[in-house]
Amino acid sequence: MLQIVTIKSDAHTYTLYIEKMYHKRSIEMKNGTQKDKHLDFFSYLISAALIIAICLGGYAEKISVAMASFMFHSDGTTKEISTTVTVSDTQTTTVPPVTESMKPHKSEICDITETPSDIKELIKKYTKLFADDKKGGGIQSVTYKKVGVTDEYKNVRVKNTTETKSLNIKKILSEPLELSVDKSKPAVLIFHSHTSEGYEMTERDWFAEGYTARTNDENRNIVRVGTEIADYLEKSGYTVIHDKTIHDKSYSDSYSESRKTVAKHLEEHPEIQIVLDIHRDSMTQNNGDKIKPINTIADKKAAQLMIITGAEEGKVKDFPDWEDNLRFAVHLQNKCETMYPGLMRPMLFSQRKYNMDMTHFSLLIEMGSEANTLEEACYSGRMLASALASLMDEYVKEEKK
């Protein structure tokens, strides 16, 4: 029977493939018919001719094309093998030119809306485990748009609580970032000052009696969200350090402890520029109900995020380069809202430092609240990473040739 094998490979790979197939078929054909042997011999003659054609053609790795070779076998199966065959740009081919619409986009790295398998298992596990929970209080879903906004330009909304700093968002967006990223070296550091911050495991409009929103289980707390961000950035081609150190054994010492962690990584990798302290918020109404910042993006519920950036004034000292962080925050807020409208709560610009004085691209980001589910927060983590990767793409160092 005729078997069609689609090959995408260079000549060396193709040669190895034919050699492997030859040995395999030699064994199989010991018990074969004379007709089968003739067909096999004929198929390898064709393959040898194709290899010679590739070599004589001077093919170079410039334009990828598909090549089909015909193999005659007796099992009647059809297979497709994905490797690579290339031709020189001087060759005439019928392959259509690659258009912009055909080029892969970052969002095609994976289905950004797909719930990771480990989280699906956690949802299943805790749905059973919490089946007999008693209600301790309500959860209110809120979509934040303009509450508390003091400054707005296009899709960037900011809540400015500083006493002396004014904002010109339009001007800030017109200013490029002093960012230069080398993809071969660590460019991003992710850590968690409040490492034990956790989430709801199942979606419901109430929280359980005696429920605690903290856990050191990194499969269920803010570390899992950091992992989602780091993984997506790495799949986008960036080198990321995700530090999972528990910094909040003593809650009051969290920021001093995380500062040591950041200092260690900056000393070991001075090329790190973007430093993200990933948290989740906690908001409670006067009646005890917890607030869940939420929006629906691409038909899937997502935890709303809030970027926090600070300024040197009043009680905040030794923060001379705060404007660099502010610029980065505004650009990232704009990118997130452009790519995923409704993902962001208004950015908080305040009289705070939170270790953001350590680099020019340091931010604290609140990934939903304790009333959000882990699934909602991780979904938002992937969208944040996608937007950050898109922003970083604009500042990648060109490789020296």
Which residue ranges define each predicted feature?
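Catalytic-core regions of hydrolytic enzymes
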Residues: 215-294
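A short, glycine/acidic-enriched catalytic loop
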Residues: 209-212, 283-321
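Active-site-adjacent substrate-binding region
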Residues: 321-348
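N-terminal Lys/Arg-rich, disordered targeting/topogenic segments
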Residues: 5-38
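Second-shell loop/turn segments in exported
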Residues: 176-177, 211-222, 244-255, 262-263, ...
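N-terminal, intrinsically disordered, polar/charged segments of Gram-positive cell-envelope systems
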Residues: 25, 60-179
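Active-site-adjacent mobile loop/cap segments within catalytic or ligand-binding domains
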Residues: 343-401
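Hydrophobic membrane-insertion alpha-helices, especially the h-region
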Residues: 43-58
